[in-house]
């Protein structure tokens, strides 16, 4: 990651968090060798990069009422998005913005109404170029809505008073792979602001500074993906080459940039712990990469929880 950390390695404290109800995960981390830096300006809708994370919920209205009762920092009331679905926005103590959306697929029950991430909102400079990237490389081939306006559902979000084009994308085909049952489906909303000149969210900052630093995908066949990205004009900018050993887990990771420089990470998992206490590890290279792991095996990951 030296190209994105000022050319020097840095130490950090990282936590990987998942919700076994379903959805993606978060890698939450903090530099320990330097002070993480915020953006030098107030972020606004349409700024280039990952502006907001979409969180799935079984009941969006109930989630809104719960978070309101907990005095969460809500940015909007319960509203309808351009597609007519219930949604709302809030921010965490560090200013990171989250959107709560209706989840369409679930892995487990869970104690909360919300699951894990189910996509994000990304600011772009050229909608056609970005749609091509997310369709050709990441497979988001279905347009849910494509509208241009000053959007009332975003009133309360910085920069939402500007005219913008919003395009929500999803996959037409179910996801495949070892973790597909857990990770589930996702949607990407691309936003291009019409009435202002946006800025790059990570301008003059490092990967790992405050904010959403990249979007990560679990993938199979890294070599084929490398050729696909290169042919599309987006070659890997970082490549761990073969297997990267992380102690209890191992895999191969790489990065590409979208047309505006937003970082996309690809991870091909080779080994994960199922039950560390008894030394049970799963070597994913020895199985059919397209088939999902059995539910009971994924649920066993809860025994690796670090408290």
What name fits each language-model region?
Residues 27-31, 85-110:
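Short, structured interface segments
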Residues 6-33, 37-66, 86-90, 116-126, ...:
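Vicinal oxygen chelate
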Residues 170, 175-176, 182-194, 207, ...:
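C-terminal functional regions that serve as terminal interaction/effector modules
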Residues 1-23, 69, 79-81, 123-185, ...:
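Core segments of cupin and vicinal oxygen chelate
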Residues 70-75, 141, 232-237:
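A common structural junction motif
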């Amino acid at each position: 990651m030296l190209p994105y950390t000022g050319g020097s390695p840095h130490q950090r404290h990282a936590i990987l968090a998942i919700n076994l109800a379903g959805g993606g995960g978060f890698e939450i981390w903090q530099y320990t060798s330097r002070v993480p830096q915020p953006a030098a300006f107030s972020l606004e809708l349409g700024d280039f990069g990952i502006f907001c994370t979409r969180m799935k919920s079984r009941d969006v209205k109930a989630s809104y009422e719960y978070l309101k009762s907990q005095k969460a920092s809500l940015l909007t009331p319960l509203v309808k998005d351009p597609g007519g679905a219930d949604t709302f926005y809030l921010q965490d103590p560090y200013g990171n913005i989250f959107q709560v959306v209706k989840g369409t697929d679930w892995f487990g029950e869970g104690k909360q109404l919300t699951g894990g991430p189910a996509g994000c909102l990304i600011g772009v400079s050229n909608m056609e170029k970005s749609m091509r990237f997310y369709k050709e490389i990441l497979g988001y081939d279905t347009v849910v809505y494509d509208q241009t306006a000053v959007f009332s559902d975003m009133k309360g979000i910085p920069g939402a008073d500007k005219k913008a084009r919003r395009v929500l994308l999803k996959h037409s085909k179910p996801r495949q792979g070892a973790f597909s049952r857990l990770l589930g489906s996702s949607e990407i909303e691309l936003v291009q602001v019409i009435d202002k000149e946006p800025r790059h969210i990570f301008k003059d900052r490092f990967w790992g500074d405050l904010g959403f630093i990249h979007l990560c995908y679990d993938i199979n066949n890294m070599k084929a993906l490398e050729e696909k990205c290169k042919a599309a004009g987006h070659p890997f900018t970082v490549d761990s080459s073969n297997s990267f050993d992380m102690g209890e887990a191992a895999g191969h990771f790489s990065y590409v940039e979208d047309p505006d420089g937003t970082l996309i990470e690809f991870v091909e998992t080779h080994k994960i712990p199922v039950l560390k206490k008894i030394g049970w590890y799963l070597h994913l290279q020895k199985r059919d990469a397209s088939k999902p792991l059995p539910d009971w095996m994924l649920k066993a990951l809860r025994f690796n929880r670090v408290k």
